[in-house]
Design a protein with these regions (language model features):
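Conserved NAD(P)+-binding/catalytic subdomain of aldehyde/semialdehyde dehydrogenases
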Residues: 1-87, 218-242
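Periplasmic-binding protein-like
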Residues: 15-16, 186-188
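Conserved residues at the C-terminal ends of beta-strands
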Residues: 18, 190, 214
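Soluble or luminal CAZymes and related metallo-dependent hydrolases
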Residues: 19, 57, 61, 92, ...
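Short, polar loop motifs at secondary-structure junctions
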Residues: 19-23, 150-151, 192-194
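NAD(P)-dependent aldehyde/semialdehyde dehydrogenase
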Residues: 72-185, 195-206, 211-240
Length: 242
């Protein structure tokens, strides 16, 4: 409704737009010179360092990942679709995927997946079929875990379809994330990796994602950055003292 849209923004000093890239571009064209804060299409990933694969930490790692994946059925921009797992003699990528599948199955008993939209049924079938050809796929009731190389990235249709990709470590992870660019919103990481990963992200001008602990990806702090900027940027102005 263009009339409602004009009434909403005509007296605004700045406008924040959440939506698809097409929606954001259309609003940018219609708003002219008015300051616009664009929050378009976004994706998120997770990273598990070797320390999180140790026997005493593995269960907590898997529970946290399962929660991040199951919350909102991966439909949000903070939902992890791809999990980078550091290669380790402690646990191979295929075994990690099997353990994650078990965790997703357990989580589904208390947090069941919503109904899969008919429009996504074919997309899910195609994603799973390609995953079986490329590497390995573990299917369950309402979820699937693929194991494949980290590049090129294949995004899932959401709804608890997730990829596990083995990597050498943080250096390779950051290299793999760079092509995702500004669409990358959040990187969940194990406690032993989150600080370093956050620092590395901050040094990459082509990335604006922030790092947070696994298990908290879907519950960001009120002041969590949006596309690398403070959430209040452009929306506040200093008051003049009387």
């Amino acid at each position: 409704d263009r009339e409602c849209e004009r009434a909403l923004v005509e007296n605004a000093d700045a406008v924040s737009v959440f939506g698809s890239d097409v929606t954001v571009a259309a609003m940018a064209e219609r708003l002219g010179d008015r300051p616009l804060f664009e929050l378009g299409h976004g994706v998120s990933v997770a990273y598990c360092g070797a320390g999180s694969l140790e026997r005493r930490r593995l269960d907590a790692t898997l529970r946290s990942l399962a929660l991040d994946i199951c919350a909102y059925d991966q439909r949000g921009c903070l939902s992890p679709q791809l999990i980078y797992v550091q290669r380790s003699p402690l646990l191979g990528a295929n075994e990690f995927a099997e353990r994650l599948a078990q965790a997703l199955g357990s989580m589904g008993a208390t947090l069941p997946r919503g109904s899969l939209p008919l429009a996504l049924g074919a997309e899910q079938a195609q994603w799973r079929g390609v995953a079986e050809v490329e590497g390995a796929l573990i299917r369950g009731d309402g979820y699937a875990v693929a194991v494949r190389p980290p590049e090129p990235v294949r995004w899932s249709p959401a709804y608890r379809n997730v990829t596990v990709a083995p990597v050498r470590g943080i250096d390779e992870v950051v290299s793999c994330m760079e092509p995702i660019g500004l669409a990358l919103k959040c990187v969940g990481a194990d406690p032993g990796s989150v600080e370093e990963l956050g620092q590395r992200l901050g040094r990459k001008p082509g990335l604006r994602a922030y790092a947070c602990p696994l298990g908290t990806m879907q519950t960001p702090a009120l002041d969590a950055p949006a596309d690398g900027r403070p959430v209040w940027e452009g929306l506040l102005r200093p008051s003049r003292e009387v």
